[in-house]
Amino acid sequence: MISSAATFRQHQEILVIATQGKSLHNFNSKIQAVVQHSGVKTGLCTVFVRHTSASLIIQENADPDVLTDLAIFFAQLVPEDGRRYRHSTEGLDDMPAHIRSALTKTSEHIPIVNGRLGLGTWQGVFLWEHRQRPHQREVIVHVSGEV
């Protein structure tokens, strides 16, 4: 319920995440810093990756075997075999990276509760780099809600 004295605010920042090739990067703390900077206490945080060969997922952040198993599963589901794909201009890992991105997400929406991300105990927000080479990935964090 929104009180009549509530002030609505929107805030947006672009995070740059350096990857070291294929890997998952938990960046909860960077997102939380944006939420805190916004001053929003109750609202919604939208996170969007500006690339077609990387994606975002919310996944378990406690047991690294979960992330390893996900990576193995996707490697088997979408193999990096240059003979399978027409698009290979940027390398044999490029089209598989596009497919992996299409099968996952480019955005996530997280409630803000009492000025904090409303994630569960074991949840982490991960940038998933699908390419083999290092990249600088841009992630837009948009926060809106009551202050």
UniProtKB/Swiss-Prot annotation:
PROSITE patterns: UPF0047. InterPro entries: UPF0047_YjbQ-like, YjbQ-like_sf. This is UPF0047 protein sll1880. It holds the Pfam family UPF0047. Belongs to the UPF0047 family. It comes from Synechocystis sp. (strain ATCC 27184 / PCC 6803 / Kazusa). Signal peptide: none annotated.
